[in-house]
UniProtKB/Swiss-Prot annotation:
Similarity comment text for this entry: Belongs to the class-II aminoacyl-tRNA synthetase family.
Stated name of the protein: Lysine--tRNA ligase
Subunit structure: Homodimer.
Cofactor: how bound: Binds 3 Mg(2+) ions per subunit.
Alphabetical list of InterPro entries matching this protein: Aa-tRNA-synt_II, aa-tRNA-synth_II, aa-tRNA-synth_II/BPL/LPL, Lys-tRNA-ligase_II, Lys-tRNA-ligase_II_N, Lys-tRNA-synth_II_C, NA-bd_OB-fold, NA-bd_OB_tRNA
């Protein structure tokens, strides 16, 4: 790669360091304390005149004032000022700092802690070493990398110059670790299921397709973990969960990324009511772990995670917002006419279930800001959920919504192998009619159900969207370290 002028200047300094017999990228380093540890013990270390060694990246502008120089370093735990003098450091290394080191270089500094005359806690440096010479300079606007797409494309640079963004991903880690703790404490077993699958299922989505050369067969990146996890319930595990990546060949927008992280769990001898309780308790505990409270602000509005959350039947929610009663309009053309009368366009070939989904997404979902359960979905929208006994056209299914986004999806799981087989056949008919997101026929899963699956509650939670809410981010790309991006226009 060709270097620009600033990179060339830094490369020349790199050559000077090597010519002086120094390795600008040594294999080892030493530090006695992290910066956070040094600052926490500052008074004691000053009182004892302890010599300590810190490491970190030079951030901000270096200041050279005759025989004295200043710089700040940070190591991921904290930030501290380096105070360097020609008298303490010696001519050679003082001039090396002045002439050959730059912002973004990573250094090792030894000395003692003191406060400057202005009261700033500082390391008064007596020895200095280079650990990594940075060839790329900081972006022109040091206050932050301004271009949003470039921040996502060069996440490493984003994390250097916008250090507050690291807190988003620390919060994400707390979300996942707390989720694991909650499930482990409730007796769920963490398992791993295949990412490459011969059939795709467990969700309405288009898959990514790949090919296994040795086996000579098409494989799919999983769109959900559901069908394998339910096989484990059949096998005798009382409760299982998996946290991992799913992949859906769909559009990219503020709440969708083709590669995303899901938690799915299944509990034997439970139903969707038990899953609602689990969601309320788990997400309120997660919110408490991240923020120390169950009441937070998202995009300027207050959110309250405390249980119990409202429960609203889907048909009721749609009727309240649109006046359309989906329990009465079962004819496809009649439903499309009613939807069109309210200004919503849907494809002529869209199925009844797809039209209801579009209707709900347009008129109801944006209003679900507080944590809310939408329950009792039509059976046509829920091919893996158990029917409500006295309302067989609807299922024991709910979705959890927060801030207008679907965060969770859960069922009382369908365990009747004959009903499941017929649902799959209905999905095949939908696929033949043009629904590219319809389920495949999974005969092995039906065979598993024939051995008997106990009454089971199942739940999926979208971790990326949950992190969005808990870190007050309006775009899913801000909570994924390396989100999917289009190729550069100049590539």
């Amino acid at each position: 790669m060709e270097l620009n002028d600033l990179q060339a200047q830094r490369a020349a300094k790199l050559a000077e360091l090597r010519a002086a017999g120094l390795d600008p990228y040594p294999p080892r380093c030493y530090r006695s304390h992290t910066i956070a540890e040094a600052l926490a013990a500052f008074d004691d270390l000053v009182a004892q005149s302890t010599t300590l060694t810190l490491t970190g990246r030079i951030i901000g502008a270096r200041r050279i004032m005759g025989k004295i120089a200043f710089a700040h370093i940070e190591d991921g735990t904290g930030e501290i000022q380096l105070w360097l003098s020609r008298a303490d450091l010696g001519d050679e290394w003082f001039e090396r700092f002045r002439d050959q080191l730059d912002t973004f270089d990573i250094v090792q500094a030894s000395g003692v802690l003191r406060c400057t005359k202005t009261g700033e806690r500082s390391l008064f440096v007596r020895e200095l070493a280079i650990l990594a010479k940075a060839i790329n300079p900081p972006p022109e606007k040091w206050a932050g990398l301004q271009d949003v797409e470039e921040r996502h494309r060069q996440r490493y640079l984003d994390l250097i110059v916008n250090r507050d963004r690291r807190e988003i991903f620390r919060a994400r880690a707390r979300v996942i670790s707390t989720m694991r703790r909650v499930l482990d404490e409730r007796g769920f077993l963490e398992v791993e299921t295949p990412v490459l699958q011969p059939l795709y299922g467990g969700a309405a989505a288009r898959p990514f397709i790949t090919y296994h050369n040795a086996l000579g067969q098409n494989l799919y990146l999983r769109i959900a973990t559901e069908l394998y996890l339910k096989r484990l319930i059949v096998g005798g595990f009382p409760g299982v969960y998996e946290i991992g990546k799913n992949f859906r060949n769909e559009g990219v927008d503020r709440s969708h990324n083709p590669e995303f992280t899901m938690m799915e769990c299944y509990q034997a001898y439970a139903d969707y009511h038990a899953m609602m309780t689990l969601v309320e308790e788990m997400l309120s505990e997660i919110c408490l772990a991240v923020h120390g409270t169950t009441t937070i602000t998202y995009q300027g509005r207050e959110l309250d995670f405390r249980p119990p959350w409202p429960r609203i039947a889907m048909a009721t929610a749609i009727a309240d917002r649109t006046g359309i009663d989906i329990t009465q309009i079962t004819d496809l053309d009649a439903l499309q006419e009613a939807i069109s009368a309210r200004g919503l366009r849907v494809e002529r070939k869209a199925s009844w279930a797809k039209q209801v989904d579009e209707l709900f997404s347009e008129f109801v979902q944006p209003h679900l800001f507080q944590p809310t359960f939408i329950i009792d979905y039509p059976v046509a929208m829920s091919p893996l959920a158990k029917r409500i006994p006295d309302r067989p056209d609807f299922t024991e299914r709910f979705e959890a919504f927060i801030a207008g986004m679907e965060i969770g999806n859960a069922f009382t799981e369908l365990n009747d192998p004959f009903d499941q087989e017929e649902r799959f056949r209905e999905q095949l008919r939908a696929f033949a009619a043009g629904d590219e997101e319809a389920h495949q026929m999974d005969e092995d899963f039906i065979n598993a159900l024939r051995y008997g699956m106990p009454p089971t509650g199942g739940l999926g939670v979208g971790i990326d969207r949950l992190v969005m809410v808990l870190t007050d981010q309006s775009n899913i790309r801000e909570v994924i370290l390396f989100p999917h991006l289009r190729e550069r226009s100049d590539e």
